[in-house]
């Protein structure tokens, strides 16, 4: 097609270069190595359980959900805002027991601060420092609604909120 400065360049789909995507996985076929994302779903559909299973899998190099292999094992850091620390401990212990793991041997860390607000500069700074110290492979912050006071329906607000997290907070 001739070059025309008034139009955008186009090419037939069949003429596009064929190249398989080069994805690096943290958890094969489930979560990308440098991914920042949200586990979404209806209330009470086990989103928190999935996130915690992912964290335990990364920390222990055991398959997530018994199926998805961990490609980059390492420490995991979690903040579960809706659960008491004893409840978090009990959940992790139950997952460990199911997998035959010793909880004391895991690089699974829990933020014990009662509240974390990603829309506050001080909390962002403290999270950045924690991430720099622990260098986790996976950070789980659950649930998003308890981590800010912004408009969840505003893509701009949520993007500003998650951008520092994606950069290692």
Where are these regions (language model features)?
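Conserved glycine(s) of the Walker
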Residues: 46-47
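Detector for small/aliphatic-rich hydrophobic stretches
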Residues: 1-18
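Gly/Ala-rich phosphate-binding loop of Rossmann-like dinucleotide-binding domains
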Residues: 59
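Conserved inter-motif catalytic segment of the P-loop NTP-binding fold
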Residues: 4-6, 21, 26-27, 63, ...
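Hydrophobic positions on the alpha1 helix immediately C-terminal to the Walker A/P-loop
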Residues: 50, 54
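Short hydrophobic/aromatic beta-strand immediately N-terminal to the Walker A/P-loop
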Residues: 37-40, 77
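Pre-Walker A (P-loop) beta-loop-beta motif of ABC nucleotide-binding domains
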Residues: 33-34
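The conserved Walker
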Residues: 43
């Amino acid at each position: 097609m001739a070059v025309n400065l008034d139009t955008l360049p186009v090419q037939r789909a069949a003429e596009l270069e064929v190249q398989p995507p080069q994805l690096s996985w943290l958890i094969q076929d489930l979560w990308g190595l440098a991914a920042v994302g949200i586990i979404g779903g209806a209330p009470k559909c086990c989103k928190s359980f999935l996130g915690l299973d992912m964290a335990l899998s990364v920390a222990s190099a055991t398959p997530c959900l018994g199926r998805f292999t961990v490609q980059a094992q390492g420490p995991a850091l979690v903040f579960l805002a809706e659960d008491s620390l004893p409840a978090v401990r009990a959940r992790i212990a139950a997952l460990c027991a199911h997998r035959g793991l010793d909880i004391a041997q895991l690089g699974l860390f829990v933020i014990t601060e009662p509240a974390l607000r990603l829309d506050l500069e001080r909390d962002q700074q403290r999270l950045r420092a924690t991430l720099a110290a622990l260098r986790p492979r996976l950070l789980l912050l659950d649930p998003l609604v308890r981590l800010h006071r912004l408009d969840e329906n505003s893509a701009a607000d949520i993007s500003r909120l998650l951008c520092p997290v994606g950069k290692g907070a």
